[in-house]
C-alpha cells in the first residue's frame, strides 16, 4: 500500500487538539503558563509554522546528522587533534561548554512547556521537535566534553557549572532562567526563539564554527554547525507568535523584544565577543565581533523590526556605540579576575594582536590600551600580584555583570534606585529601565556581591569567595600562555636600550 503524501494528512495531524469536558480550559491551560493575556483563544488559529516536517522526515534528517557528527568526532579523538590546538582557542571551547551546555538542557524544559501549554495546537505539536532538538544538543555537548575530560578538567564544568555559584555562571543562568523558565509561552517564544536563537545564536554557533575551523578544531566546528542547523529551524517558532502579537498586542511584543535584546546582547558580549576578539588565534580570525554583530545581528534585527512594523529599541544609539567597547571591558575584567573563572583566559594583547585590535577598533588604545600597558609593566617587573584582585567588582542587579562593562572607561557611572528600602545598582540606564518595568521580577535576586556583603559567603575573603563558587586549584583560571605575550614588550624595550 502506497504511503499518503504528507500534504494529504499533515494538517489533520498537526491540528489535533483537546476537547475538554471534565475540566475548565483555564485550568488545563493556566494563563501564567500560556501567556495570551487579552488575546482571545481563536486568534491563535492564525498561528502557522514557517516550516513543515513530519516525524518520519525529522528522524531521517537527524539520523544523517548524527552519523556525520559521530564519524568526525571519532576520527578527531583518535587523531588526538585537540592536543595540537592553540591554547587560546581551547579557552573558547571551555567557556562555551561551561556556559551553554546546561542552557541547552534548560531549553528542553522550555520546549516541553510549549508542548503542554502553548495556546495553539500547531505550536504544541511543533514544540515536540524542539524538545528533541534540545535534548540532542545537550547530549552532543556532554559527549564532546567527556571525550576531552582527560585533556582538561575544565570540561567537567560543562555539566558541573550550573550546579555552582561561579559568578559568570550565575549571570548566564539568571538570564536563561528568566527568559526560558520564568517566562510564559508567548514571552519565551519572542525572547528566546526569535531574539536569542534566531538572532544571537547565529553568532555563537556560526561565528565560532567558522573560527574553530580556521583554528583547526574540526570536531568543535562540526558540532557547532550541526547544532546550528536545528536552531535555525525551531528558532522560527517566534515568527508566527509575533504575527499574532502584532495583530492583537503590539505594545507587549515591542517591550518583550526590547528587553530580551539588551539582556541577550550583554551576555553574548562576554561569551562570544571575548572569544572572537581575544581567544581565537589572530591569524585565524575571520572578522571582529563588531563586524559580525553589524552583519548578522544589527541588519537582521532591524529587518525584523521593519518587516513587522516595530520600532527600534529606544536605546539603539547606545547599543551601537557600545559595540566598540563593551566586550573589551568584559575581557579585561574577566582576565583580571581570572582566579574566579573555570577556564584559562588569554590576555590577547601581544603586539600583533594589539595591531589587529587597533585596526578593528580605532578607539581601543585610548580606552583599553593604557590599562593593558599598566598590566604589562607589572608583569614584566615581576609584580604579578598587582595584576590579581584583592576584592570583588560591583555587579549589576539585572545583568549580573560588572558595573562599567557595557561601554568604555569614560562611562563608568552606575545607575541606582531604591526599591522597598533596598538599593539596586545597574550597569546602564537600559538595565535600570528593565528593572523598573517589572521590579518584582528582579527584586528578589541577589548577585555574588549582595551575598558577600550579606554574610552568606564565609570567610569574607577572595579565598572564601573562590571556595563558595566551587572553584578548585586545577580549574581556577590563570593566564593561558603564562604571560608570554607580555614578553613582546620586555624584549623590545631591552633591544631599544
From Swiss-Prot:
GO terms for molecular function: alkene monooxygenase activity; metal ion binding. The keyword Metal-binding applies. It is an enzyme of class 1 (oxidoreductase). Keywords: Cytoplasm, Iron, Metal-binding, Monooxygenase, NAD, Oxidoreductase, Plasmid. It catalyses: propene + NADH + O2 + H(+) = 1,2-epoxypropane + NAD(+) + H2O. Pfam families: Phenol_Hydrox, YHS. Induction: Induced during growth on aliphatic alkenes (such as propylene, ethylene and 1-butylene), epoxides (such as propylene oxide and 1,2-epoxybutane) and chlorinated alkenes and epoxides (such as vinyl chloride, cis- and trans-1,2-dichloroethylene, 1-chloropropylene, 1,3-dichloropropylene, epichlorohydrin, and epifluorohydrin). Repressed during growth on other carbon sources. One of its GO terms (cellular component) is cytoplasm. InterPro entries: Ferritin-like_SF, Phenol_Hydrox, RNR-like, YHS_dom. Binds 2 Fe(2+) ions per subunit. The two iron ions could form a binuclear cluster. Fe cation 1 binds at residues 104, 134, 137, 231. Its EC number is 1.14.13.69. Inhibited by propyne. It is found in: Cytoplasm. Fe cation 2 binds at residues 134, 197, 231, 234. It comes from the Bacteria. Its main location: cytoplasm. Its cofactor is Fe(2+). Belongs to the TmoA/XamoA family. The alkene monooxygenase multicomponent enzyme system is composed of an electron transfer component and a monooxygenase component interacting with the effector protein XamoD. The electron transfer component is composed of a ferredoxin reductase (XamoF) and a ferredoxin (XamoC), and the monooxygenase component is formed by a heterohexamer (dimer of heterotrimers) of two alpha subunits (XamoA), two beta subunits (XamoE) and two gamma subunits (XamoB). Component of the alkene monooxygenase multicomponent enzyme system which catalyzes the O2- and NADH-dependent epoxidation of short chain (C2 to C6) alkenes to their corresponding epoxides. Also able to catalyze the oxidation of a number of chlorinated alkenes, including trichloroethylene, cis- and trans-1,2-dichloroethylene, vinyl chloride, 1-chloropropylene, 1,3-dichloropropylene and 2,3-dichloropropylene. This is Alkene monooxygenase system, oxygenase component subunit alpha. The lineage of its organism: Bacteria, Pseudomonadati, Pseudomonadota, Alphaproteobacteria, Hyphomicrobiales.
